[in-house]
């Protein structure tokens, strides 16, 4: 999962992009990068770390230009080495930088095509570098001479759609020409546009979530629709065209469950409102399965589950209390690489308020249960604080299958619900009872907010992969690549190599 942003303005954009990345930091805490364009020259800085740590004053001063792109990354394909931080750059044709949110599912095939047919070398394991090279090749094929017009760019994206499979929301710069953005034909990963009126004309921001637009003082214009390409030239003129033959809207359901900020609007649906609906439908199920008096108090697991827990408590007429305090300086545990790190971080991240638990039958509400590491630790914390009985509720259905579209759910065996019944999962997390959201209720939670959304990418819950190209062999290969057993010092070795090369005079 990543957060991306692109800006075309009439004044320097370095601070705008930095601020946007801070607003998207929840989408990735592994690396950050910014590339700006002034005339025909790119300036770029990227590194591993949080936005506030990657960019210092000297870095910001070097990022000159009135257009630029940025990204915050959590790695889902390739490694987490600094050399794979984005944006990526290629010098021909014209000079292009690119930032990508998603995951390509036919990347190995594309690498072979790149080498044998397109004569292009891929230097990292990142699928984003592959995507950039496909874009560059198709742009070379679509243009003649030194000119570049919107028609050629839309032809480029149309050709890319025919070659590339998977999920991709993209912002790219073409040196001296402008900003290109596009979304895959299934609309899996979010992308939206905002604008601002100035004395010199309109300026635009394109970002993963609407919260980035609003936080910059831009007005939300609309979402980029599946398969669409948008080009904004350096004068701030916007062009758009549908570039896919059969686009369909299949937004990722997990964006609404966990990934997106609650104050964002994705594809016309308020994330906050969908989470309230999840709580409402979960309350209906709990009412059917538990009798009056079995639950004394409802508590959320901060922060994503809070809207669902509040609505659930309201509908069941139960007391709602905050039982855990979150340390906001600890990253999101689901997005932390390495199971051992996740387990250790839970108690550093959350601290129980003992008086809220003592002698009570507690219903704990979380947004989802993925690996079960966090859930198990939280149940134990509740017991240690004196809870009489601990019931655990998930606002999402059981996560039983890997996600191949840009979320780090690497192996089936790591998913606690894979191959287990609800009763077995309950025993694994040591709860007294467990309640999962039904998948149809989850989908209704989103459709109730925006009835235009009828189909979803919900493969981690139902095992249905909307792109239609995912086989068991593919999942086996993916698990091998993303396995947590990867040597811990691998990235350190690669980074050291890069550092040595960087100091060669």
PLM ranges: what are they?
Residues 12-14, 76-77, 106, 179, ...:
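Flexible loop/turn segments at secondary-structure boundaries
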Residues 1-226, 231-296, 301, 389:
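Conserved short alpha-helical segments that host acidic/polar catalytic motifs at enzyme active sites
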Residues 298-301, 305-312, 316, 320, ...:
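Extended, hydrophobic alpha-helical segments in both membrane/secreted and soluble proteins
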Residues 202-209, 248-249, 333-347, 387, ...:
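Flexible glycine/proline-rich, aromatic-decorated loop/lid segments
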Residues 84, 135-140, 335-340, 406-407, ...:
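Short, surface-exposed amphipathic charged segments that create phosphate/polyanion-binding patches used
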Residues 161, 176-178, 183, 217-223, ...:
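PRPP-dependent phosphoribosyltransferase catalytic core
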Residues 55, 129-134, 320-331, 428-446:
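A conserved beta-strand->alpha-helix junction
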Residues 314-362, 373, 400-410:
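Short, glycine/charge-rich flexible loops or terminal/linker lids adjacent to PRPP-binding catalytic cores
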């Amino acid at each position: 999962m990543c957060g991306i942003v692109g800006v075309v303005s009439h004044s320097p954009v370095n601070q705008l992009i930095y601020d946007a990345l801070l607003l998207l930091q929840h989408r990735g805490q592994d690396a950050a990068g910014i590339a700006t364009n002034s005339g025909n020259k790119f300036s770029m800085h990227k590194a591993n770390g949080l936005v506030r740590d990657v960019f210092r004053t000297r870095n910001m001063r070097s990022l000159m230009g009135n257009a630029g792109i940025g990204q915050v990354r959590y790695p889902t394909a390739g490694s987490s080495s600094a050399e794979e931080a984005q944006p990526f750059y290629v010098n021909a044709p014209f000079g292009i930088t690119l930032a990508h949110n998603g995951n390509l599912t036919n990347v190995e095939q594309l690498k072979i095509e790149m080498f044998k047919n397109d004569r292009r070398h891929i230097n990292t394991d990142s699928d984003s570098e592959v995507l950039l090279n496909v874009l560059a090749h198709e742009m070379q094929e679509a243009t003649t001479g030194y000119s570049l017009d919107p028609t050629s760019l839309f032809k480029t994206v149309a050709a890319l759609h025919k070659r590339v499979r998977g999920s991709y929301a993209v912002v790219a710069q073409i040196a001296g020409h402008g900003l290109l953005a596009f979304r895959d034909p299934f609309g899996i990963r979010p992308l939206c546009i905002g604008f601002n009126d100035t004395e010199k004309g309109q300026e635009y921001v394109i970002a993963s979530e609407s919260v980035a637009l609003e936080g910059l003082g831009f007005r939300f214009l609309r979402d980029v629709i599946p398969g669409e390409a948008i080009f904004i030239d350096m004068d701030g003129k916007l062009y758009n065209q549908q570039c896919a033959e059969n686009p369909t809207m299949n937004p990722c359901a997990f964006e609404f469950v966990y990934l997106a900020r609650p104050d964002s609007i994705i594809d016309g649906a308020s994330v906050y409102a969908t989470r309230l609906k999840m709580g409402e439908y979960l309350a209906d199920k709990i009412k059917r399965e538990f009798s009056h008096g079995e639950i004394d108090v409802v508590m959320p697991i901060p922060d994503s589950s809070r809207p669902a827990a509040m609505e659930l408590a309201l509908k069941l007429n139960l007391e709602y209390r905050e039982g855990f305090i979150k340390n906001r300086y600890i990253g999101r545990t689901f997005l932390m690489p390495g199971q051992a790190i996740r387990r250790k971080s839970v108690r550093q991240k959350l601290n129980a308020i003992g008086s809220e638990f003592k002698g009570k039958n507690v219903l704990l509400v979380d947004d989802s249960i993925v690996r079960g590491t966090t859930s198990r630790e939280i149940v134990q914390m509740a017991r240690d604080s004196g809870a009489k009985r601990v019931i655990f509720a998930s606002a999402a259905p059981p996560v039983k299958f890997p996600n191949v579209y840009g979320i780090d759910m690497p192996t089936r065996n790591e998913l606690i619900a894979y191959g287990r019944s609800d009763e077995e999962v309950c025993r694994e997390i040591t709860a007294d009872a467990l309640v999962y959201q039904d998948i149809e209720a989850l989908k209704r939670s989103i459709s109730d907010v925006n009835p235009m959304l009828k189909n979803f990418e919900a493969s981690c819950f139902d095992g249905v992969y909307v792109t239609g190209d995912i086989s068991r062999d593919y999942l086996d290969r993916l698990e091998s690549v993303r396995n947590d057993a990867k040597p811990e010092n691998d990235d350190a070795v690669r980074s050291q190599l890069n550092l040595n090369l960087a100091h060669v005079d």
